[in-house]
UniProtKB/Swiss-Prot annotation:
Keywords on record: Ribonucleoprotein, Ribosomal protein
GO-annotated molecular function: structural constituent of ribosome
Protein species of origin: Buchnera aphidicola subsp. Baizongia pistaciae (strain Bp)
Sequence similarity: Belongs to the bacterial ribosomal protein bL35 family.
Any one annotated GO CC term: cytosolic large ribosomal subunit
Cystine residue pairs: none
Identification of the protein by name: Large ribosomal subunit protein bL35
One Pfam family linked to the record: Ribosomal_L35p
Sequence segments annotated as region (Disordered): 1-26
GO biological process: translation
């Protein structure tokens, strides 16, 4: 049986934590930043955990993490 390939786009977007959960970067921080206030942009810099519904999909994408 062949090896399962890792989905490279998912490998770049998600990191696995010590507890087995996955963290991701937040959206809305790429462009049109002048009208967003500093507090909002600072809040968006933090990483967040992915939802419970998406964990199973991400595990399929990243079989060797």
């Amino acid at each position: 049986m062949p090896k399962i390939k890792t989905l490279r786009s998912a490998a770049k977007r998600f990191k696995k934590t010590e507890s087995g959960k996955f963290k991701r970067k937040q959206a809305h921080l790429r462009h049109i930043l002048t009208k967003k206030n500093t507090h909002y942009k600072r809040h968006l810099r933090s990483k967040v955990m992915i939802s419970k519904k998406d964990i199973q999909k991400v595990r399929l994408f990243l079989p060797y993490l």
